[in-house]
């Protein structure tokens, strides 16, 4: 009976199981399992295990081939309790048997036990070898212990194993997983010999850390060194191309995969290619890849659904979902729900939310994060907050989503508070966190804090990240520092379409439309294809700078040369441009021929043009259309009020005021912000609360007299009666917040330095004239950003050309 059972064991554990640890085994993965309730393999019966133990008791030979094979068999079959019991009965186990046990614990995801067993091995005086350390290092990575990793690395150096490629590959993976790219680079650079796994570990490690640029650069270096990419290299490189938005490089890697036949029949490589084109917005390419796939698993379907959803093809996304379920018999999983959410309006989003709850997909960290994204984009911030607060487990991506939701909904100070909370936690902000929070600094007007986060970016190895640099360009531009915005743009090595759009729009809002146009020509010369946002920025530049002919040329070239259908935003820019000429009959004709129903914003463009040309008839017509859509549009009421007051139509002024009061509409209080010595100072109209009030008003009086201003002005939106206005100083433009902030900036900054002020409303004409003269008088550049554009006052002139 015993002989029969032993022969059965020999048949089960053939000679292949006796091979020592190979390079393939170095890649073994396993999930962490905190207890010992492991899954038992039915291949070994309980009687067989008993016979093996009895054999050891009889033979007392540690090197008995049957027992060695049995121990290896227990470990390979994840029967670690039996393996441990058999091992403990062996008095003198050699390094091979210790390695078998460590490998077994690691393969089962029992990383703590594996590290403890290694310590026991060292304590027993058994010398570890090059087969020991790859699994020990993998277990250290599994418990995320950098301290233990450093100790193991030191031991590897002491034993002279740093020349072993498998040990070094494991160290690279360890350091990359723990976010220590510098240590991984050092190991990689000092390796006397590298294999494809060495390169793959570095390339995928950079990508996992959000450094797609370094990942791509290393992939190129690998090719130069004569290594042929395998499926893992290819998938990592494709992911890096998506991360840094490098369509040209992505297509080159795709072509290489086709030539090397890497993509043939490999569903994961094909899915990576599909995902890359999806993120580029190349839906037709993605469809071609998807339709050409011989095999499609749930991952491929999910990517295609996500492709449609991400690129605004909502109907196609749901049709693809339906086809997957009905024609292919695949059941939607949690990722399907995640990918459908971007295509969902609030109603469909709640439906998917309910479906996920019914299917038991929740709680699920990734799905909950996607729900936060969806509710944030739909303006349902409260729902997003509820989901975030109820999450049992949060990672940095969850924090990124709720921060982005706050920023998207204009809650910039809440976003900054949440970012500080994340900063104080054990989690480390990643590149997406930084890119998400930078717009909040731009909108909160905190340039000094923006510079602090910029310094962090440089120190945190994100200085080559295109997405972050794009956000920095936007932040500096919106904070009024066009020079630093340009410096960040120049630092971008892989400039994508967002990079060019950001810098084109930056110069546009600062009134330098000619430079925006020149940058567009540079963009085309760099072979970066423009998109809808590019032309929106370009047309805005033409409108702000009064380049009418150029604007028409770019508008007509959108469809003709680039195949881009103009959207409602482009028609709005063109209406601004036409309105600038004062040709309102042409503007009305343009509105009638427009293939869209005019929005309140479109009518607002006409209203603004009528204000600049003092055409009250057109203004009343445009305002009437706006009130049909937005009866409580504060800006529209205030603009009409100003126009009536400037025309001396006081009855209409009173009528508008009464109408605003009846609707509970109040005028937005003017507030100006200026930074001095790293601190923001806020002023309101007639403000006397500042500690330097006396000095501010002294400077204001001196400058006002020197520029030849009178002491009293009639303010057009005063609530006082017309006959009383001339007797009042309280509403004089001399006390407007933008002047107070400017004067404080003049006395609190070094002589000759630029003064930058942000104002939340449009500055009045009197203040505009004052600032022009003040810039010439003080020989200082004064930059004022109002609710529409930035004004660069220098030597008595403004970049807006007196049209804003």
Curated annotation (Swiss-Prot):
It holds the Pfam family PPR. Residues 710-804 are annotated as: Type DYW motif. PPR repeats lie at residues 63-93, 94-128, 129-163, 164-194, 195-229, 230-264, 266-296, 297-332, 333-363, 364-394, 395-429, 430-464, 465-495, 496-530, 531-561, 567-597. Residues 602-677 are annotated as: Type E motif. It is found in: Plastid, Chloroplast. SUPFAM superfamilies: TPR-like (SSF48452). InterPro entries: DYW_dom, E_motif, Pentatricopeptide_rpt, PPR_At4g14850-like_plant, TPR-like_helical_dom_sf. Keywords: Chloroplast, Plastid, Repeat, Transit peptide. Residues 1-19 form a transit peptide. One of its GO terms (biological process) is RNA modification. GO terms for cellular component: chloroplast. GO terms for molecular function: RNA binding; zinc ion binding. It comes from the Eukaryota. Residues 678-708 are annotated as: Type E(+) motif. Belongs to the PPR family. PCMP-H subfamily. NCBIfam families: PPR (TIGR00756). This is Pentatricopeptide repeat-containing protein At4g35130, chloroplastic. It comes from Arabidopsis thaliana.
């Amino acid at each position: 009976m015993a002989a029969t059972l032993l022969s059965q064991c020999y048949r089960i554990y053939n000679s292949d199981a006796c091979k020592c640890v190979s390079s393939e085994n170095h890649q073994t993965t396993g999930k962490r399992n905190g207890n010992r309730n492991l899954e038992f393999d039915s291949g070994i019966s309980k009687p067989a295990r008993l016979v093996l133990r009895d054999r050891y008791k009889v033979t007392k030979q540690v090197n008995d081939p049957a027992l060695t094979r049995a121990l290896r068999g227990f470990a390979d079959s994840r029967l670690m309790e039996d393996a441990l019991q058999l091992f403990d009965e062996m008095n003198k186990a050699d390094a091979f048997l210790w390695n078998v046990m460590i490998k077994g614990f690691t393969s089962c995801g029992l990383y703590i036990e594996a590290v403890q067993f290694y310590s026991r091995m060292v304590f027993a005086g058994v010398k570890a070898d090059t087969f020991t350390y790859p699994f020990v290092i993998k277990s250290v990575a599994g418990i995320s212990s950098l301290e233990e990793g450093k100790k193991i690395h030191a031991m590897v150096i002491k034993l002279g194993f740093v020349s072993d490629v498998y040990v070094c590959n494991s160290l690279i993976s360890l350091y990359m997983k723990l976010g220590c790219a510098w240590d991984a680079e050092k190991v990689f650079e000092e390796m006397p010999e590298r294999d494809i796994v060495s390169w793959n570990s570095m390339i995928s490690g950079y990508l996992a850390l959000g450094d797609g640029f370094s990942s791509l650069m290393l992939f190129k270096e690998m090719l130069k060194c004569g290594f042929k990419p395998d499926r893992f290299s290819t998938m990592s490189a494709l992911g890096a191309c998506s991360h840094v938005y490098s369509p040209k490089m992505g297509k080159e890697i795709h072509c290489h995969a086709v030539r090397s036949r890497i993509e043939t029949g490999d569903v994961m490589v094909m899915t990576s290619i599909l995902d890359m084109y999806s993120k580029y917005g190349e839906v037709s390419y993605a469809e071609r890849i998807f339709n050409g796939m011989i095999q499609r698993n749930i991952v491929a379907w999910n990517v295609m659904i996500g492709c449609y959803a991400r690129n605004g093809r909502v109907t196609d996304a749901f049709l693809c979902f339906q086809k997957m379920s009905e024609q292919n018999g695949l059941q939607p999983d949690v990722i399907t729900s995640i990918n459908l959410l971007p295509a969902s309006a609030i109603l469909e989003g709640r439906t998917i939310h309910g479906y996920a709850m019914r299917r038991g997909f929740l709680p699920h960290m990734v799905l909950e994060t996607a729900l936060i994204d969806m509710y944030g984009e739909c303006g349902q911030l409260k729902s997003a907050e509820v989901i975030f607060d109820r999450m049992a487990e949060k990672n940095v991506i969850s924090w990124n989503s709720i921060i982005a939701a706050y920023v998207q909904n204009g809650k910039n100070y809440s976003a900054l508070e949440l970012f500080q909370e994340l900063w104080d936690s054990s989690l480390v902000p990643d590149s997406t966190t930084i890119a998400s929070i930078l717009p909040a600094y731009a909108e909160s007007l905190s340039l000094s804090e923006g510079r602090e986060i910029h310094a962090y970016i440089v120190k945190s190895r994100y200085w080559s990240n295109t997405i972050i640099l794009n956000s920095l360009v936007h932040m500096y531009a919106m904070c009024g520092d066009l020079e630093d915005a340009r410096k960040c743009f120049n630092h971008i090595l892989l400039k994508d379409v967002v990079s060019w759009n950001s810098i084109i729009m930056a110069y546009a809002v600062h009134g330098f439309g000619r430079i925006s146009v020149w940058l567009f020509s540079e963009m085309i010369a760099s072979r970066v294809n423009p998109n809808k946002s590019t032309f929106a920025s370009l047309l805005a530049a033409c409108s702000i700078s009064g380049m009418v002919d150029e604007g028409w040329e770019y508008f007509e070239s959108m469809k003709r040369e680039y195949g881009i259908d103009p959207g409602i935003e482009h028609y709005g820019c063109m209406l601004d441009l036409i309105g600038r000429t004062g040709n309102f009959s042409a503007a009305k004709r343009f509105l009638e021929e427009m293939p869209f129903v005019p929005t309140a914003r479109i009518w607002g463009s006409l209203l603004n043009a009528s204000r600049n040309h003092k055409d009250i008839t057109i203004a009343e017509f445009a305002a009437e259309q706006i009130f049909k859509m937005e009866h409580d549009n504060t800006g529209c009421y205030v603009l009409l009020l100003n126009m009536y007051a400037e025309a001396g139509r006081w009855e209409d002024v009173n009528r508008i005021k009464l109408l605003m009061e009846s609707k509970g509409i109040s005028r937005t209080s003017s507030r100006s912000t200026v930074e001095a010595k790293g601190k923001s100072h806020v002023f309101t109209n007639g403000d006397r609360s500042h500690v330097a009030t006396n000095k501010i008003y002294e400077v204001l009086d001196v400058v006002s007299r020197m520029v030849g201003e009178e002491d009293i002005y009639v303010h057009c939106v005063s609530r006082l009666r017309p006959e009383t206005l001339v007797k009042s100083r309280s509403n004089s433009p001399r006390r407007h917040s933008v002047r107070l902030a400017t004067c404080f900036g003049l006395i609190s900054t070094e002589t000759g330095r630029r003064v930058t002020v942000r104002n939340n409303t449009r500055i009045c004409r009197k203040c505009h004239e004052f600032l022009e003269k003040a810039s010439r008088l003080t020989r200082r550049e004064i930059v004022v950003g109002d609710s529409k554009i930035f004004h660069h006052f220098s030597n008595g002139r403004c970049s807006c050309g007196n049209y804003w």
